[in-house]
Regions:
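Short, small/polar-rich loop/turn modules that mediate ligand/substrate recognition or access, typified
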Residues: 39, 131, 136, 195-197
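Active-site helix of classical SDR
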Residues: 79, 115, 123
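Residue(s) in the substrate-gating loop at a strand-loop-helix junction
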Residues: 99
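Substrate-binding pocket helix/loop in short-chain dehydrogenase/reductase
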Residues: 54-56, 60-65, 161, 165
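Alpha-helical segment proximal to the catalytic Tyr-Lys
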Residues: 84, 128-132, 193
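Short C-terminal tail/terminal secondary-structure segment
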Residues: 50-53, 104, 168, 184-185, ...
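The beta1-alpha1 cofactor-binding region of Rossmann-like NAD(H)/NADP(H)-dependent oxidoreductases
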Residues: 17-29, 61, 178-179
């Protein structure tokens, strides 16, 4: 576990299990973080799930609620409670994870793409509200990244679809999680102090074609 690894290196850590689609759990997560560290300087809202592949007419309400509950409402809920703390401090930085699915369409992935489009709208609106209060909010849009979600797509029989998408990536490879982490750290740092409401696409050139 990452928290255990960091603790072993001498860092103070706190691991909290949280279902981001549950507002009460999200509030408790933020409260526990503030109790442990005294404040909340930065947050990365990264939880996400894929929808079951289906045409729009065949997508189920259950799957829609599951995906939007995590990918859209989850981001909204996390921001809500993070901002309540940052507002008290008068400072902070939030990065929300959208996806290239947030700037493109995707057949049979309407719920996922719709939720990720929504994340960008949430981010821009909140960024306008809080920029003058010392709080910056931005979005990252990762492309094809070697993550557990990609592994699940392969295991679920979508390897051919993933390979076809990868052939369209000009850089010719999957992204690495640490490449996204570096971008998030930059957006949260003082080096990005003028960056507000921005949508940073990190996809190896996939979306510029």
């Amino acid at each position: 576990m990452a928290a255990d690894q960091l603790a072993g290196e001498g860092y103070k850590t706190l691991a909290v299990v949280c279902d981001v689609s549950d507002d009460q759990q999200v509030e408790e997560m933020v409260n526990k973080t503030v109790a442990a560290f005294g404040r909340l300087d930065a947050a990365y809202n990264n939880a996400g799930v894929q929808n079951e592949l289906a045409d729009a007419a065949d997508q189920t309400r259950q799957d829609f609620d599951r995906v939007t509950g995590v990918n859209f409402r989850g981001v909204w809920s996390c921001m809500k409670y993070e901002l309540q703390q940052m507002r008290k401090q008068g400072s902070g930085a939030i990065v929300n994870c959208s996806s290239i699915g947030g700037i493109l369409g995707g057949a049979q992935r309407g719920t996922y793409h719709g939720a990720k489009h929504g994340v960008i709208g949430l981010t821009k609106s909140a960024a306008l509200e809080y920029a003058s209060r010392g709080i910056r909010i931005n979005t990252v849009c990762p492309g094809l990244i070697h993550t557990a979600m990609a592994e699940k797509m392969i295991a679920g029989g979508q390897k051919e679809a993933l390979d076809a998408m990868l052939q369209q990536v000009p850089i010719g490879r999957l992204g690495r999680p640490e490449e996204i982490a570096s971008a998030v750290l930059w957006l949260c740092s003082d080096a990005a102090s003028l960056v507000v409401g921005h949508t940073l696409v990190i996809d190896g050139g996939y979306s510029i074609q």
